């Protein structure tokens, strides 16, 4: 029972770190990366469809994304979706290929992105701490039902705390890498 609780907590903490990494991929740095457009979608046959399902997105160079639309009619919709997003990008269309040059980030924009990234990291830490709280609550319930001893309770809480510390350190490492990436000129 204790091992199941620890394993569940560890898996959920790892998922929280992965979710943070995925969220940070969508935040624009100075470099072109296809995941930058992963949050955008277009109206396609009456349904909202992610851009990466109706087009091929590649990084042409470090400052340009190239989007090859599968259906020529969608080129205008994809271009409009990119312009309407809060990414501050101006796509240029040439038939079925849309080029999206990424302007260099201003110092002010970099600092605001760092604040956003720190907020995301803090949300990740809070999620990990909530997982720890849930796991410790489950352990306390076992102790209350006399299914485990107080020694087992204390030892398990210490082990869960170690898992929490590892997850928070991973979040801090991911944050440091992203901040460094954002502040590079």
Curated annotation (Swiss-Prot):
Which Gene Ontology terms describe the biological processes this protein takes part in? cytoplasmic translational termination
**Keyword match Cytoplasm:** yes
Q: Which residues cross the membrane?
A: none
Specify whether Cytoplasm is a keyword of the entry: yes
Compartments, record wording: Cytoplasm
Q: Which GO terms describe its cellular component?
A: cytosol
SUPFAM superfamilies in the cross-refs:
Ribosome recycling factor, RRF
The record's similarity note reads: Belongs to the RRF family.
Q: What does this protein do?
A: Responsible for the release of ribosomes from messenger RNA at the termination of protein biosynthesis. May increase the efficiency of translation by recycling ribosomes from one round of translation to another.
Name by which UniProt lists this protein: Ribosome-recycling factor
């Amino acid at each position: 029972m204790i091992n199941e609780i620890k394993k569940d907590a560890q898996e959920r903490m790892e998922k929280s770190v992965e979710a943070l990494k995925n969220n940070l991929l969508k935040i624009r740095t100075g470099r072109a990366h296809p995941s930058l457009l992963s949050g955008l979608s277009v109206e396609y046959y009456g349904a909202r469809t992610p851009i990466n399902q109706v087009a091929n997105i590649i990084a042409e160079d470090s400052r340009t994304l190239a989007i090859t639309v599968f259906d020529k009619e969608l080129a205008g919709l994809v271009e409009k979706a990119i312009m309407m997003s809060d990414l501050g990008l101006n796509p240029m269309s040439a038939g079925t290929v849309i080029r999206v040059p990424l302007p260099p980030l201003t110092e002010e924009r970099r600092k605001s992105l760092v604040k956003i990234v720190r907020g995301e990291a803090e949300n990740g830490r809070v999620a990990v701490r909530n997982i720890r709280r849930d796991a410790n609550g489950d352990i306390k319930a076992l102790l209350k039902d006399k299914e485990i001893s107080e020694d087992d309770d204390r030892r398990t809480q210490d082990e869960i705390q170690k898992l929490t510390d590892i997850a928070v350190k991973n979040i801090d490492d991911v944050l440091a890498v992203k901040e460094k990436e954002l502040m590079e000129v």
